Amino acid sequence: MTKEVIVESFELDHTIVKAPYVRLISEEFGPKGDRITNFDVRLVQPNQNSIETAGLHTIEHLLAKLIRQRIDGMIDCSPFGCRTGFHLIMWGKHSSTDIAKVIKSSLEEIATGITWEDVPGTTIESCGNYKDHSLFAAKEWAQLIIDQGISDDPFSRHVI
């Protein structure tokens, strides 16, 4: 017998969300009661735009560092295959507003303060596709996203 599985992100109506936003996807509890929160960090409007791979890859590496500098409990921040944003997985309970503030602050630093030397994991030893990075694109996208404002509500614009 095949187990029925529903993947929440495929149930989301991508035509009614209003990016950029942070959305709480789920809170799950492990066998010992540990809480994990999963967020949809949507940076660009689905089916209207996508971030090219090199820019997204550099944003991914920078967020891995910058988010951890701003909030405890980050497990992982992985890009969506559609290249419109990231899954952010956290230990503990966090609100969409708190995460949106962290993302905004991180993107502001990417847009204005980061140099190539600040990007972690860009060598052949530390990255599985080290030649596919673009700090220029990461900075451009970060500024575009900041200019639009990041909402803590995916369906109505509530910019933080």
Curated annotation (Swiss-Prot):
Its cofactor is Fe cation. It catalyses: S-(5-deoxy-D-ribos-5-yl)-L-homocysteine = (S)-4,5-dihydroxypentane-2,3-dione + L-homocysteine. Binds 1 Fe cation per subunit. The keyword Iron applies. Its EC number is 4.4.1.21. Fe cation binds at residues 57, 61, 127. GO terms for molecular function: iron ion binding; S-ribosylhomocysteine lyase activity. GO terms for biological process: quorum sensing. Keywords: Autoinducer synthesis, Iron, Lyase, Metal-binding, Quorum sensing. The keyword Flavoprotein does not apply. HAMAP family: LuxS. Homodimer. Belongs to the LuxS family. NCBIfam families: PRK02260.2-5, PRK02260.3-1. Involved in the synthesis of autoinducer 2 (AI-2) which is secreted by bacteria and is used to communicate both the cell density and the metabolic potential of the environment. The regulation of gene expression in response to changes in cell density is called quorum sensing. Catalyzes the transformation of S-ribosylhomocysteine (RHC) to homocysteine (HC) and 4,5-dihydroxy-2,3-pentadione (DPD). This is S-ribosylhomocysteine lyase.
